[in-house]
Amino acid sequence: MNFKNHHQKKRFGQHWLVNNLILEKIKEVAELEEKDFILEIGPGRGALTSKLLDSKISRLHAIELDEDLIDLLNNKFRNDKNFSLQQGDILSTNLDSINKKITKVIANIPYNITGPILDIFVGRLGIISKNNYNKIIFLMQKDVVDRILAKDGNTNAGAMSVRMQLISNIRRICDVPPSSFDPPPKVFSTLVVFEPLRPEMRLDIKLEKYLDKLLRISFNSRRKMIRNTLNSILSAEEIEKLSESSQICFNSRPQDISINKWIKLAEACIKITNKNQ
């Protein structure tokens, strides 16, 4: 069996990147160095893998779910001592043995596992990761990136926007048309870079946890005014005091509140709750 005889499996969300310009762009933004230990998720036919291995790096470790591709990939890169391959599902694979070595994560993400992948590699509010990733480069569904980068007042703004922007620096590199893939997906993709914030640059862990809860409650009822969503965690009296002392308009809807104001609101909620205990 060879790559030409391998048929993509729809259940794995396989859309292989075939646009050489985008492959080169991913390599360029990765800014690879000799010390880099790269984790590539879903190498597929190995087109991007080949580009990355052309650079001097310490190691490229790839994880591929499709068992039919394992022998093909091992054969393709059999002469490259910096390449290693593991068969498995990235959502359940134990990375403990290599996690502290990994410096960069690169992937063309299957659309159906975008959320869990972001949680694992970019991180979550209220959880300080022990990973050493300095750069995460993902090719993702465009509308997800639009939501992640949305600012207050934008209809795309949501809990994901606030969470992701609070734990990482994010750069949109370029949009990628369906024709860049085999087979072409139905939607555009976007190449995006996440640079996770170091622990010392993050908010206080207790504040992050409270803010995460506040975002979940608020955006679950995004059509409601903040005044009406807070009643599940604060009394009517507390909400009234908060609205009088806060710089936030409590008649605003969640998507209209800036990240800085979300932080101030969480701080104020914690303060008033502690005072009344």
Curated annotation (Swiss-Prot):
Its EC number is 2.1.1.182. It catalyses: adenosine(1518)/adenosine(1519) in 16S rRNA + 4 S-adenosyl-L-methionine = N(6)-dimethyladenosine(1518)/N(6)-dimethyladenosine(1519) in 16S rRNA + 4 S-adenosyl-L-homocysteine + 4 H(+). Transmembrane segments: none annotated. Keywords: Cytoplasm, Methyltransferase, RNA-binding, rRNA processing, S-adenosyl-L-methionine, Transferase. Disulfide bonds: none annotated. It is found in: Cytoplasm. One of its GO terms (cellular component) is cytosol. Pfam families: RrnaAD (PF00398). Belongs to the class I-like SAM-binding methyltransferase superfamily. rRNA adenine N(6)-methyltransferase family. RsmA subfamily. Specifically dimethylates two adjacent adenosines (A1518 and A1519) in the loop of a conserved hairpin near the 3'-end of 16S rRNA in the 30S particle. May play a critical role in biogenesis of 30S subunits. NCBIfam families: ksgA (TIGR00755). This is Ribosomal RNA small subunit methyltransferase A. It comes from Prochlorococcus marinus subsp. pastoris (strain CCMP1986 / NIES-2087 / MED4). The lineage of its organism: Bacteria, Bacillati, Cyanobacteriota, Cyanophyceae, Synechococcales.
